[in-house]
A protein has these predicted regions:
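Extended, H/D-rich, highly charged conserved domains that either
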Residues: 1-61, 99
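Sequence-level detector for tyrosine residue identity
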Residues: 9, 47, 57, 62-64, ...
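Generic surface-pattern signal
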Residues: 35, 59, 63, 67, ...
């Protein structure tokens, strides 16, 4: 089920999926989806607009309209300190509260919104990083070892676990099945 809550940005929009075991998950297309063509992040203007929305989410100035009524969310910092409940309205919160597995995303340096968020999460000035107990894992299928090494160093500086699964002879499907198996195994071991 797709809850298409926004036209341009993808702060609150997700896809609710149910697996064979009846467990429910949400898939967040952070940079838009084909069903909402205007939501696809193309260009600096869109990425910077997303950063503005994320900054508002942090500060408690993020607002939206639901059923004709304005809704204003509490600051993320208050949620992280336990002053108010997490509402699960956005994927932004999840970067601080639950394990995240990033798959199928090049995480190119032009994706300034995600780099901004990872930087914000890693900065001890904004939060007591000891309170952030979740793990972010990035699975990289980059073939170029130099690019992979550079990205690994930067991600690790942002407290992101980096796992390199190179695509062998362009057999991307096997690489992704291996990644999905690793994710499934990590869920069972907790």
């Amino acid at each position: 089920k797709n809850n298409k809550l926004e036209d341009i940005y993808s702060i609150r929009t997700c896809l609710d999926v149910e697996s064979n075991s009846r467990s429910k998950s949400k898939i967040w297309h952070l940079h838009g989806d084909i069903d909402r063509a205007k939501s696809i992040s193309l260009g600096l203007n869109h990425y910077c607009g997303t950063i503005g929305k994320m900054d508002g989410y942090f500060k408690g100035t993020y607002e939206y309209t639901l059923n004709g009524k304005k809704v204003k969310l509490d600051a993320l910092s208050k949620k992280l300190r336990g002053e108010v409940q997490h509402d699960g309205i956005s994927w932004i919160e999840l970067f601080f509260t639950t394990n995240i597995h990033i798959v199928g995303l090049s995480l190119d340096y032009s994706e300034t919104d995600l780099w901004w968020l990872l930087n914000r999460r890693a900065r001890p000035l904004n939060f007591n990083t000891n309170d952030i107990i979740n793990e972010i894992i990035y699975y990289d299928t980059e073939i170029d070892e130099t690019k992979a090494s550079d990205k690994k160093q930067l991600l690790e500086a942002f407290n992101v676990k980096y796992i390199h699964i190179p695509i062998d002879n362009e057999k991307w499907d096997k690489a992704y099945m291996r990644i999905f198996d690793m994710i499934e195994h990590s869920k069972k071991s907790k």
